[in-house]
Amino acid sequence: KQGLETLDPNGGMAEEENQRATRGLSTVVHPMIAEAATQFNAKAIAELYPSGGPVKTVIVGDPSEEMEEQAKRVKDYMNYQITQEMPEYFPDLDQMLFQLPLVGHTFKKVWWDANLDRQCSQFVKAEDFIVSPDSKDLYTSSRYSHVIRMPRNDYNKYVKAGYYLQSEYSGNDTDPSGDIGSEIEGVDPYGDEGTDEVMTLIEMHTYYTFDGIDGGEDDDDDNVIALPYVVTIDYDAEKVVSIRRNWDEDDEKQQRRDWFVSYKFLPGTGFYGFGLFHMIGGLGKAATGS
């Protein structure tokens, strides 16, 4: 939160500029950071989403004609999925690559959507992804959570598809991270009662042991090995709406499946990376003041 609070539309200098305006001074902000973020976005999007599609294949070992044809089929099909069946992929990637250099850390979630019946890719903001700052990396973290905001009508579709349990809407007066995001974007959240109901879900990817299953008989047994699950909670109703196994059914080792990709701009002092506001935010202020 400390790093994100600097990301208001004026580069973290809103209060200072209000004081300058009161004194009759110029409120023009030096575009140093905005220019750097725009240049990074333009170069990165060209590399990660070329005109032919973002997927490339590499054959490990000695290639044969049959393997090359198979690799081409895989590449063509995956590019078709991304460019034709996933309309959210490009705008989400574009937005992520602009925010990444600013905040220093972003995430992408890739999963099979039970409602849309297809693969989906979603840009997840840093303030909507909760993980211990002491974690070494995403893949060795014992628990992390994704804050999901979903229109009530969409939630009902997932209930009908058997993905979530029914949960009565109880309002969203509080939000675990919405206040931070609204402050960053400079907007005031609002909603029309009855027509704009938004469910706030906490999707926790964690290790747990349930009574009577997982090979454990006693929760106090220190030798019991917890297994990976995805537990989803209705934040406002304080109700569990989904518990799902998070390993392949045929996997004897029962290893956790990871649905998120972590992107760092620069290495930080902990789990989260550093961005331009962390590194040259003070320089931007100095350039504006001069």
Spans of model-derived segments:
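Extended alpha-helical, oligomerization-prone segments that build pores/tubes and scaffolds
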Residues: K1-S290
